[in-house]
Amino acid sequence: VNLFLCQRLRGMLYYKSVRRQKPTQMSEFYGGLLLKNYFSLSMQPREINQISALGLAHCGDAVFELLVRSWLCDSGKLTTKQLHRATVSYVCAPAQAARADRMLPLLTEDELAQYKRGRNAHVHMIPKNATHEQYSKATGLECLFGALYLSGRLERINELFVLTMEEPHAD
């Protein structure tokens, strides 16, 4: 009975996954399931514009933190406690706002539009350690990184990240 249920469930998952999306270069079949590779997305601008600014910021927050963590691990031997504290100091809103200010002159017109979209988004809660202006700038930076990630522009994300990390972060 369990084998029958597993096969039936597998068939349902296969049917739903195939029905929902068409095979693309970033999809592959695995065990009868069509899997989408979320590490190499390449959304069109119209698809990205359908995502809310805060949704893009949510994604961009993870992208930025992963870059910071990778950068810190690559920069030398630190204890876990030191890595965590350094990560927190780089991903907090005041530090991200300072990076956003340094990044603005480097942005293209489309990138600036994504940044402003995030910066102007209405947020409901602002942390105590940041001003409204700092939090808005940080949200703009995260929105930009989210949009670049979802459009598959990883080289541009890395370029902007490296250029802003060259200078010391704000404490």
What are these regions (language model features)?
Residues 2:
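Non-catalytic nucleic-acid-binding interfaces of large nucleic-acid enzymes and RNP effectors
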Residues 5, 9, 13-171:
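Double-stranded RNA-binding/processing signature
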